[in-house]
Amino acid sequence: MSTASAFAINAPSFVNASSLKKSSTSSARSGVLSARFTCNSSSSSSSATPPSLIRNEPVFAAPAPIITPNWTEDGNESYEEAIDALKKMLIEKGELEPVAAARIDQITAQAAAPDTKAPFDPVERIKSGFVKFKTEKFVTNPALYDELAKGQSPKFMVFACSDSRVCPSHVLDFQPGEAFVVRNVANMVPPFDKTKYSGVGAAVEYAVLHLKVQEIFVIGHSRCGGIKGLMTFPDEGPHSTDFIEDWVKVCLPAKSKVVAEHNGTHLDDQCVQCEKEAVNVSLGNLLTYPFVRDGLRNNTLALKGGHYDFVNGTFELWALDFGLSSPTSV
């Protein structure tokens, strides 16, 4: 039959847990929390019998007792009582002294360790980021930045999501001056409309007519929150958001197609399909811009779609055949 021996030891006051309570003593150490350590050992006072072989089968000694901390709910023991209990327990069970010493050293080290994690400083982050850019890129490539000072002539216009994980310059290694980038929720392109979404319209017009980009590239990505919203928001009824629901419904045809073709599949799988179908809807919406259609007919502009999977580290690229041809006169 085994008995349980217990002793109380103080824990540092910075420990925070809902199950812990501060000591109610009024002494200078009243803010210290008490911990109860319990060890199980045999009640026999005789020393353990050495291992021996019986029928050529090894007999192993019982494992050494382990001190396990159990936080008391009341925390009534004072600092002095905890130390006295510890001393008494170690006198009675000297074999536990190394284990207790190691545990105390651990607690002491935790209490003495400085908090090395400095609070986040956004201004310092911006400053250090620019210094790194200037010293490693700007200063080391003067020819590029001298040329960019004269103007820009990017080959790509890129629509990408605002998601912080999918920066196209990072993912596709675009260099400064190489891509004219528009980022918004779920990388969507609304149809041509002079009364709304003028920010997107202005960007497309400027890129095609003034910058003379050669490619318009719409990039979707994995685990897109905007696409998940599109798949889960009700199609009808009042909105629960001021802007998001109205915006993502730009690609409502993609949702309808996915629901029709993948009905019964898991939502996550539907979202993956919708991430790609929404890209196709945006590519189709680009055809509603007259200057985009003109560029396609004249072979001065091309449209492509893509999907970046940052979970698996893959990238898909595709083009759509819109069947456009130059007008003919009869």
From Swiss-Prot:
The protein's Enzyme Commission number: 4.2.1.1
**Keyword vocabulary terms for this entry:** Cytoplasm, Lyase, Zinc
Instruction: Please state where this protein is localized.
Output: Cytoplasm
Q: Which InterPro entries match?
A: Beta_CA_cladeB (IPR045066), Carbonic_anhydrase (IPR001765), Carbonic_anhydrase_CS (IPR015892), Carbonic_anhydrase_sf (IPR036874)
> What processes in GO biological process is this protein linked to?
carbon utilization
**Predominant localisation class:** cytoplasm
State whether keyword Cytoplasm applies. yes
Q: Which domain of life is it from?
A: Eukaryota
Q: Example GO molecular function term?
A: zinc ion binding
- Entry text on domains: Possesses a transit-like peptide, but it is proposed that this peptide is not removed and that therefore the enzyme stays in the cytoplasm instead of going to the chloroplast.
Protein's job: Reversible hydration of carbon dioxide.
SUBUNIT field: Homohexamer.
Family designation:
Belongs to the beta-class carbonic anhydrase family.
Name listed for the protein in its UniProt record: Carbonic anhydrase 1
Q: Which organism is it from?
A: Flaveria linearis (Narrowleaf yellowtops)
